[in-house]
Structures are given as structure tokens and as C-alpha cells.
Amino acid sequence: MSRLFLQVRSSISFIVCATRCFLKDFYESRQSVQSDKVAALLVGLAQDNVKVVLVTTGGGTEAIASLFCGGGASRVMLEVVVPYAKKSLESLLGGEQERSCSPGIARHLAMKAFCRAVALETPPQHAVGVGATASLRSTNPKRGTHRIHVAVQTLFATTTATLELTKGVRLREEEERIAGQLILARLASSCTSGKNKNNFPVMRVDLSSEETVTIHTTTAPLSWQLLVSGEQMIVDARSEAVLGAEKLSEAETRQRLVFPGSFNPLHEGHRQMASLASKIAGQPVEYEISITNVDKPTLDYTDLESRIVRFDAVERVWLTRAEHFTEKVVLFPQSTFVLGADTFMRLWDPCYYDGSTSKMSEAIAFIAQQISGFIVFGREYKGSFCDPQSLSSPSSLLNKCRFVPEAEFRTDISSTVLRKYRDQ
């Protein structure tokens, strides 16, 4: 009986050992194939003169190891950033974020990476920003889904991929591997428009039969590309025409009634302000959205598209790179600007002038000289209604203002609250 037991135990040990060896060889074989594909990907990117900056948070670090474990990475990769802590992510994106793992955050990171690549002296047409954010299995079980969002930003398009993982069937290491695979796959797929597109490998992502990757792409018109590349400061949001081109002259931006804002989203409060301002000024409102902003990340193409579609077809919407008001008044000379009280107050806040009161004074004098006037509306600010008539405005601006009293207009609609409900 004991001899039989020993024989059975020996057989089981052999089977276990053989299985381990098989799995080890199988895994190493797949790793070798993946390494070969990564090497081929780097070669293809290098041949197209592509330069990449990667930013990932919450997972996906295996993609970094895959890209740098062999030769050729230095010809393609400019920088990798891993803002893992909440404060680190907020510092990178310019403030507290409503959610840390979402398609929007992935796009913000990708645009940040794209801008960084351009700042490192990469021609915009060759710059690629990859942003990834993941919520994966951790020591403490998560109430939400396990998911990965990967965005790729180029001069030509914004692409976002979302993968929701089947919860509770994989180890953290396995989910990390899939996150890394998805990053590599999206990098390869988003860079296949060059002359060497046939040389790019198809990167594998180990999904179950129930899992699918959802992809959304926003392709930019030429005017948007010129704006993002910095070749233009202002474009018509719905037109291919740009300033200096045959269809659009600088006269079209002079003596306008301009309503600047982020409009994320455009809501009834904005509509009421525009309607009343139009009656006061006797001309139609034209909206302005700056893709760059002192307080917020640069807007990507998907962001722009989602905001612009909310405007009526007959309404004119301008896209600019004017993050400072001193730039807006140059783009729209002798125009009247529609502002909320909170935005109006920023015009004389030294924080927006590197803390310099002298720079602030110079800017205020310049703005007052360039504009036709302001129409200023009251807004809820820090929990209470701010009546613009109660503000201690600089005299040079005060003389140019038409304040709309609370009796004529008040709405407490919050864009922040609307975004919160929209993103739930």
C-alpha cells in the first residue's frame, strides 16, 4: 500500500513539474513574441520620426518595461512620467480632478504628454502623447469596476480606448500585464498613418470572450490642427478658414460682442447671459473657447467636439490660444466682452500675473485701451451671490463696464455640478 502511495505521489509530482515547465516555456515563448513585436514597433516609429511621451497612472507600468528592455527606445521615447499619488496627478493636471480614472483623465494626460513632446523640440506632426489611467485589483477590494483607459494624442486626432475587466478573475499582476498590452496596442494602432504603416505589428491584448475594447476617435479639421500646433492663434470652430486665409479677414473679429468661456457644458445660464447681453449691445454674441487655460489642461479634440456640438448651427464659435485676457483683446480689437463676476475679478488678481502688481497694472491699462467695454453679470461665488456692482473694480475698467444687477439676471446653475451628474 505504501509502495502504491509513493508511486502515485511520484506521478503527481512529475505531472505538476511537467505542467510548470510547459507553462513556463509557453509564457516565455509568448513573452519572446511580444518582445519581438515591441522591437518592430519601435523600428516603425523611428522610421516615421515619431517621438513619444508616455504618462500613466494607476497601472500600465509593464508597457514601460517592454519599451525599454530592448534596444531602440532612445530613438522614439522622449520621456515617461508616472504620477501615482493623488497630489502628483493633481499637480500635473493643474488642480483637483473630479475623477482620477476616466476617459477624460486619460485624454488630459495624453494632451499633456503631446505638449511635452512638442516642448522638447519635436515637430507637432511627429509628436505623440500617450496617457493611461487604470483602476486595477488592489489589496483592498474596490467597489467600482476594474478598468483601463488609454488615450493617444497626435496633431491629427484624439483617440481613447476603454477596457472594463471582468472583476475578480485575475491577479493584480495579470491585470497590470493587460494594461501594459493595451497601451502598446493603442500606440501602434494610432501611429499607423505614416509611410511605414505596413511595418507596424498587431499588438496582442489578452482578453476574455466577455471583454471588449471600446474605441472613440475624434479627427481634427485642418483649422484645429493649425491651432494646436501653434501656427494660428484663432480659428472659426466650424470652418477650415483661418486668419490670413482668403475666407477670413481680421475685420471679422473687430468690434464684436464676445462671450469667452470654457462652456463645459453650455447651459441655460450661459444662454440667458448671451440673450441679455445681445439686447444690451444691439448685436449677436460670438462665443470664444481657448484651448489653453491658466488653470486647466489644454483641450483635446474630443473635448472640443463635445462642447461645440451644443451650440446652434447659426451661432459663431471661435477657438483660440488666448489663455490670458491681454491676448483676447488683441484677437478681438475694440470688442465688448461678456463676463461673469468671477471672471471679471480675475482681471485684477495678481495671482494671474505671477504675483506682480506692476504687471497687473500694465495689463489692466492695456485691456482698458483695447476694449470697447464689458457687460458683467453676477455669479454665485464661494457659496454666495456676487453682485458685480459691489466689486472694487479698477477705475480704468469701471468706466468701461455695464453691470447687470441681480434684479435683471440671476441664475445659480453650476457647470461643476452639471459635469458631476453627466459623468456619473
PLM region spans:
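Generic short N-terminal amphipathic or hydrophobic helices
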Residues: 11-14
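Helix-adjacent hinge/juxtasegments
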Residues: 93-119
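Nucleotidyltransferase catalytic core that binds NTPs
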Residues: 26-45, 66-69, 82-87, 91-94, ...
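Amphipathic alpha-helical interface surfaces
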Residues: 63, 105-113, 359-363
